[in-house]
Regions:
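Basic/polar phosphate-binding segments, predominantly the helix-turn-helix DNA-binding elements
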Residues: 149, 153-180, 205-230
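…primarily DNA-binding HTH/wHTH and HhH modules…
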Residues: 218-303
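Terminal helix-turn-helix DNA-binding modules in bacterial transcription factors
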Residues: 173-208, 234-263
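DNA-contacting interfaces and partner/effector-binding or oligomerization modules
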Residues: 3-120
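Structural motif
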Residues: 32-34, 57-58, 83-86, 130, ...
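Short, Lys/Arg-enriched, Trp-marked, Pro/Gly-tolerant hinge/linker segments that flank
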Residues: 109-158, 171-184
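Membrane-topology and secretion signals of cell-surface/extracellular proteins
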Residues: 18-30, 48-55, 79-81, 186-189, ...
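Basic, amphipathic alpha-helical hairpins
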Residues: 137-151, 170, 174, 191-200, ...
Length: 303
């Protein structure tokens, strides 16, 4: 049976031409910084899955996970391996190979999600955002409808809810306001297209209803702090969702606690109380305000 003395984890990062051995895995776990376009490769054949579960399960938000299965004899000896792997929400599961090919991993990493609404919703759950089934459905539908509508009024009509009811549902769950999720979902669709094609930012923006490439670029930067040029040079989409969550949290729009994040940053009790009052005022204004706010995109496209 093949046994390797090497560490069970590698990193796969730009320029995506090789796997980088990760010897100090503890340095990755709990690391607060964003890792744009980085994935963790877990070689189950190089260690003990139960012992190595922690780094895979508690990897930083935005870091995708690729799992390389052990040789067949070890799979038969440990039928719980797939249950262990599933708990870590892997991007892909690869058959055993002593030296996985970087090109093969890159091709998998570059694939767009098969079901973007469900996968974004699953990612939010993995990050520790717990909501009831109805709110989860509304989140998934918002991401789904982002390909068809561009205003929260149009979104509310499609969801058969008033803007107030929709906003209250998101607010009670500690989520960003619906318009932010809608606009981020549109930006995420643009990012995936930028990664997969050579289309210009203007072409991608026009296809999604933005006035020009600058409008798309500015929207993306406001929501995530990321520009299209960086998106295009990196693979994956989870890190962009993570960038959005962190931006919302820093600005008070996300009150739900992210897994591994401090409950409320470094703010003391007085700051938290003042922030809560500001959030409630902001949410009330957004519920009653115009669709044409600074974060809103162009008018809904004609059907």
């Amino acid at each position: 049976m093949f046994r390797s003395s090497r560490m069970p984890f590698d990193l796969f990062a730009p320029p995506y031409d090789r796997l980088i051995p990760l010897e100090a895995v503890d340095d990755l776990v709990g690391e607060p910084k964003l890792w744009p376009g980085v994935s963790l490769i877990w070689h189950l054949g190089r260690g003990k899955p139960t012992r190595d579960l922690g780094p895979a399960l508690h990897r930083p938000g935005g870091v995708s996970l690729f799992v390389v299965l052990p040789p067949s004899p070890r799979l038969r000896q440990n039928p719980d391996i797939f249950r262990i792997v599933e708990s870590c929400r892997p991007h892909s599961i690869l058959p055993f190979h002593e030296e996985p090919d970087a090109t093969e991993i890159a091709s998998l990493f570059a694939r767009p999600p098969m079901d973007l609404p469900s996968q974004v919703t699953d990612y939010l759950t993995w990050r520790g955002i717990q909501v009831d089934l109805e709110t989860r459905r509304l989140v998934r539908r918002t991401v789904e409808l982002s390909d068809e509508v561009s205003t929260v009024s149009a979104l509310s009509r499609r969801l058969y809810l008033s803007r107030r009811a929709l906003g209250r549902r998101f607010y009670n769950a500690g989520l960003p306001v619906p318009s932010h999720l809608l606009h981020f979902s549109r930006v995420l669709r643009a990012a995936i297209r930028l990664q997969r094609t050579s289309d210009s930012v203007a072409t991608v923006g026009n296809a999604l209803g933005y006035a020009d490439g600058f409008a798309l670029s500015n929207q993306m930067h406001r929501l995530t702090g990321i520009r299209p040029t960086e998106v295009r040079s990196r693979m994956g989409w989870e890190w962009l969702v993570e960038a959005w969550l962190r931006t919302e949290r820093a600005e008070g729009g996300l009150r739900a606690t992210l897994r591994g994040a401090p409950a409320d940053g470094a703010a003391d009790g007085a700051d938290r109380q003042a922030r809560g009052q500001d959030e409630r005022r902001a949410h009330r204004n957004r519920w009653h305000g115009s669709d044409r706010g600074s974060l809103d995109g162009p008018s809904e496209r004609a059907s």
